Amino acid sequence: MEEEEVVVVVDEEESERRRQKMIEEEKKRLDEEMELRRRRVKEWQEQKRLEEEEAKRREQEAAAGAGTPAAAAGADGDSNAGKKWTLDGEESDEEGYKEDSQNAEDDGGITADLPSEVNDANVAAPMEEDEIDPLDAFMSSMVLPEVAKLETAVASMESMPASNMGDKNGKSAKDAVSNGDKKGQKKAMGRIMQGDDSDSDYDDDDDDEGGSKDEDDEEFMKRVKKTKVEKLAIVDHSKIEYQPFRKNLYIEVKDITMMTGEEVATYRKNLELKVHGKDVPKPIKTWVQSGLTSKLLDTIKKLGFEKPMPIQAQALPIIMSGRDCIGIAKTGSGKTLAFVLPMLRHVKDQPPVVPGDGPIGLIMAPTRELVVQIHSDIKKFAKSLGINCVAIYGGSGVAQQISELKRGAEIVVCTPGRMIDILCTSSGKITNLRRVTFLVMDEADRMFDMGFEPQITRIVQNTRPDRQTVLFSAIFPRQVEILARKVLTKPVEIQVGGRSVVNKDITQLVEVRPENERFLRLLELLGEWFDRGKILVFVHSQDKCDSLLKDLFQRGYPCLSLHGGKDQTDRESTLADFKSNLELVVNYDVPNHYEDYVHRVGRTGHAGRKGFAVTFISDEEERYAPDLAKALELSEQAVPQDLKGLADRFMAKVKQGTEQAHGTGYGGSGFKFNEEEDEARRSAKKAQAREYGYEEDKSDSDSDEEGGVRKAGGDLAAQAIAAAQAAATLAAAKAASNANQQVQSTNAGSLLSIPVVANAPNNEATARALQAALNIQQNLARIQAHVVPEHYEVELDINDFPQNARWKITHKETLGPIQDWTEAAITTRGTFIPQGKIVGANERKLYLFIEGPTELSVKKAKSELKRVLEDCANHALNLPGSAQTGKTANSEMQGFLVKVFLGRWTAILVFLDDGVICNIRAEKLDKWQVRVFYVKVADPLGYSITE
């Protein structure tokens, strides 16, 4: 047994030696191939240089003599060169040879034969290789077909008239095409190409004349900040011939028809219903009277729904009649079935959906959880009817959603942001809205509050105009009313119940506390309530949620976070844990309107249990105090004196006109850049310029067209001297007339302004004083001209770009190469001001200040900075679920992978180009046991890893 074991060991050692030998032989063969290729490249470059010298010599001879037909020689050279081994179309390691090779090819081509060494090497290479070279296989399969296409395009261009073949520099059309392609390739790479080639790419005067570099900052901001909402083209319905469909599917039964007006009014009063509109159908009493199919009625019976709820009793006949409807009802009032049942009946009345068709029914909801809930309710009825329903929402795998849409679905339940993503993907080939004839917007008030107005508007614009539209909302604020007027046609309004009021079983406590005292108070509340049950803390932003979670972890409190950036499975798990036994609600950040406060506080005190809610508010947030005081009064709770004082003080300011009421919320944070905002932006910019002392004249108004570049330094000194001379002339004239007026220099560009005392003793003393003052001004202007030399400066606003774009554009790794290349100084100025926050009197939004010795250097720097910003914005826009709603997109990103071996598990971390680590989902790959860790970024340097 021992001898056999020894033999096995020897065999393993022998196999290891053989393997090492094979590796060495393979390495040697690759080295030889590399050396051969290097020698080929060297010989080819030398031959190119000789050909260039020969071409120049021919040009000189042609210019001196009668002129030899260089074009014919060049054509012969091209045909001969096609038979030689060259590196045309490949990237050379040395950039200096690129431009030389292009000039040589354009002037005369390659006419001389390559050295015999290269030819011998070409012949011997296939004999030495036992198999096809991978590079040659790649070239023959991928590159050469593309080269053939380009040659065909060039040949077609060469067949054009001679006047169109070349430019003023004598370059051929082929040269222009190749230069344009390479130029586009360099720009697409997103890197600064320094050296001669960079100058040719970025300093081309022709490009500066008519290219995109002349666009002003406003146009640049509008183009770069164009969201997926704006990239979704608006459909021209006049050019589409839609198939007709039937809306009215309701037949009123005899029992309902025989009801008198008084009976209907009494019945609606008992149901707490209020309706507004013309020819409103009467409410029903039983399910049989609704006009639904027998299969739907059987499913309703199996689910145990005995009779319609108030909103269902009135909404079903209205929607089944084909009328547009507005339903104002609280959450949990049964409004989901009020639009789901008519939608199912509407879908069954239409031709079946085939692959490639879009949905017939479209339901939009604000949150993922509500989408899942509506989808679950529809599935209960759709199975018996043979109807497919797809839920489209963020935080989950988009691939499965796309595959289900491609197979065909009659009903789609979606969040607006993810639906825009799907419609923009693959140029709209995945799905479309051409067949949507039944549109539902559920909880429209919450969608506006979350900033979905741009997405909703664009989706509605892309559906057919004669659709049936249903809108449900907990309240009916002005923003929702404006949308209803736009998208609904003669709607019927249904209101169920009264105004939302906080449950009287919930004890509400409002404390006036500054920001720096809230965390300690929160710890005190946790110490008191932690053992009694679960606690829910509300904050304004995702970042604050994550930072507060980290702080509570450090204090030893086990807790979970819930926000839009979390994975869907994490959200569902967290919600499942907090569905019951919730005892305390803490509004760490004050709600911004009354309804939001009611929704937050209403999470506790369910099923007749007592609840407790604590809300923090500071003196700076006094605009929200009246809503809190009103909520306490309506729920019959005592209003604290300090809160009442805050509310009274703010309302007094509103009456005086120094403050403006904050409204009812529901403005959202979505990006809505229309013409009115464009004009408001320009007006604010001009007002800010006047505040900082800039004179508003014609040159300032035209600065946008010139890129905003202005002259400074020496030019300012010249203006100061000219203004001083004008002031001297004016002062002398006034002194001569002995006017008792006070003369003051009005030079805005100089450093000193000296008043002259009125009622001077005599004219001579006044004139001498004026002359002395003017001499001082002229001297200061000359000193300024020497200290501050003539230069150019421009500004670039970056405050409104995404966080990753701002970080990238202000980092020294980005600014350093641009400054070295353009010889312009770039500094970051201003402070970051979030969207929605009012800019202070002495504040400016974050911007880059660019100054350089020449106007060209400043323009180059600004153009390159714009390119970097545009790349970052496009990168963020292309991420799944990154429809811009004024918040930084939290989504899965792709970069390069780094494997970290941890025992039998492997951690894969995804790093972006700028070094930021992002969250990725755990998964298993084939036979590998791979566990991906969630990496939460606390700051650029420190991060925590959790499974």
Curated annotation (Swiss-Prot):
Region annotated Disordered sits at: 1-132, 159-221, 658-710
Its Enzyme Commission number(s) read 3.6.4.13
Which GO cellular component terms, listed alphabetically, does the Swiss-Prot or TrEMBL entry include?
A: nucleus
**CDD domains membership:** DEADc_DDX46, KH-I_AtRH42_like, SF2_C_DEAD
Task: Point out the coiled-coil segments of this chain.
Answer: 854-879
GO molecular function, one example? RNA helicase activity
State the span of motif (DEAD box): 442-445
* Entry annotated with the keyword Lipid biosynthesis: no
> Among its keywords, does the record have rRNA-binding?
no
Q: Which InterPro entries match?
A: DEAD/DEAH_box_helicase_dom (IPR011545), Helicase_ATP-bd (IPR014001), Helicase_C-like (IPR001650), P-loop_NTPase (IPR027417), PRP5/DDX46/KHDC4_KH (IPR056149), RNA-helicase_DEAD-box_CS (IPR000629), RNA_helicase_DEAD_Q_motif (IPR014014)
Keyword set, alphabetical order: ATP-binding, Coiled coil, Helicase, Hydrolase, Nucleotide-binding, RNA-binding
Similarity comment: family membership: Belongs to the DEAD box helicase family. DDX46/PRP5 subfamily.
Q: Protein name, please?
A: DEAD-box ATP-dependent RNA helicase 45
Species of origin reads: Oryza sativa subsp. japonica
